């Protein structure tokens, strides 16, 4: 068992308040029920117990038949994984129920799962409009108002314990620059101020208070007299939500930490429990954008990155470090008592992981 003592850690707490104390969190022998990547992840706290959640994704064979809708739940207090009810789909697409590139987040003790896309044998992909609330103790999915514009490979950011922002992403045939705002109190959608950069998919971002930061992803380039192509987009945009009108976001561009894009990073907004500094952290990903099997659009195998970027919201400055763990193909970053983790993902040589990754 790995034991963490608060006095020995640089303690971070997420926007969701997490207590700082000596506690055993993870067993090194604990593995997920199955290898999974491109899975939506979230964490919820119910009755003072933390749960880590994985929704849908891709199995170890990495083909269309390995796209699934499984739900895996990790009970932190018991150091135990369980497979639970599968993520529903209102209207199966050509009989397909599994999906990739869904996104998830949490408000209070409820997780929210958005979209994703199905993959057919002929490689056709369809964005799913479904939205579900997941209640972990009851193991129950509750259907909610569908997305006005179905997206996958997007970002879901929670705000004020009520709203969730879906920023950009892919819709069926191309990227969109929309910021779709879901109100959990009214179960209604509205459009927020659009994303100011090039529309992307596979980007990453986090939020602290009313400040959010979005970085990188993949854009679509259109060419003269030939087909369009995918290209890495290295750009970061900071947004400030108007607390009196949450649909209004003031956007501006910030300096990129390296000038080199990373695709499908894990990211999260954090507050340092000692210094109270606020930052957005980006971990892993790959410099080479790729198809869902981990092979680059350029035909070369994509390699995971060990880079960690930390953006300080007060100073507007970046800190770049490296992790001992290089992973990619993530949809979110989780945090417990100072430790940053991802669930599954891909390692070198496109290996689909069956573990909790520690950074």
Model-derived features: where do they sit?
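Bacterial N-terminal signal peptides that target proteins for export
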Residues: 2-15
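Secreted/luminal cysteine- and crosslink-motif detector
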Residues: 5-7, 22, 237
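Bacterial N-terminal signal peptides
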Residues: 13-24
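Kelch-like beta-propeller repeat domains
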Residues: 25-359
């Amino acid at each position: 068992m790995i034991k963490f003592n608060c006095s020995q850690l640089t303690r971070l707490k997420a926007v969701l308040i997490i207590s700082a104390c000596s506690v055993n969190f993870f067993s090194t022998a604990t593995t997920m029920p199955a290898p999974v990547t491109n899975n939506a992840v979230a964490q919820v706290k119910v009755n003072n117990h933390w749960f880590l959640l994985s929704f849908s994704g891709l199995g170890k064979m990495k083909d269309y038949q390995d796209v699934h809708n499984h739900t895996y739940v990790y009970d932190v207090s018991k150091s135990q994984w369980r497979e639970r009810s599968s993520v529903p789909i209102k209207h199966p697409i050509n009989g397909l129920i599994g999906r990739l590139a869904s996104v998830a987040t949490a408000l209070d003790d409820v997780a929210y799962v958005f979209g994703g896309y199905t993959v057919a044998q002929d490689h056709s992909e369809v964005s799913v409009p479904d939205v579900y609330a997941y209640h972990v103790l009851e193991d129950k999915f509750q259907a909610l108002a569908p997305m006005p514009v179905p997206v996958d490979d997007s970002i879901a950011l929670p705000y004020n314990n009520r709203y969730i922002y879906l920023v950009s992403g892919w819709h069926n045939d191309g990227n969109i620059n929309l910021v779709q705002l879901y109100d959990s109190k009214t179960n209604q959608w509205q459009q927020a101020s659009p994303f100011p950069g090039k529309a992307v998919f596979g980007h990453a971002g986090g939020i602290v208070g009313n400040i959010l930061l979005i970085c990188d992803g993949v854009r679509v380039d259109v060419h003269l007299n030939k087909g369009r192509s995918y290209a890495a987009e290295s750009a970061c945009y900071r947004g400030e939500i108007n607390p009196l009108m949450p649909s209004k976001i003031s956007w501006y561009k910030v300096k990129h930490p390296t000038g080199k894009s990373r695709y499908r990073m894990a990211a999260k907004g954090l507050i340092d429990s000692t210094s109270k500094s606020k930052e957005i952290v980006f971990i892993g990903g790959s410099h080479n954008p790729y198809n869902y099997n981990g092979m680059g659009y350029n035909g070369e195998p994509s390699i995971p990155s060990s880079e960690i970027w930390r953006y300080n919201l007060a100073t507007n400055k970046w800190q770049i470090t490296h992790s001992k763990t290089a992973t990619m193909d993530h949809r979110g970053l989780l945090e417990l008592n100072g430790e940053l983790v991802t669930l599954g993902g891909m390692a070198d040589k496109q290996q689909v992981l069956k573990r909790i990754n520690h950074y």
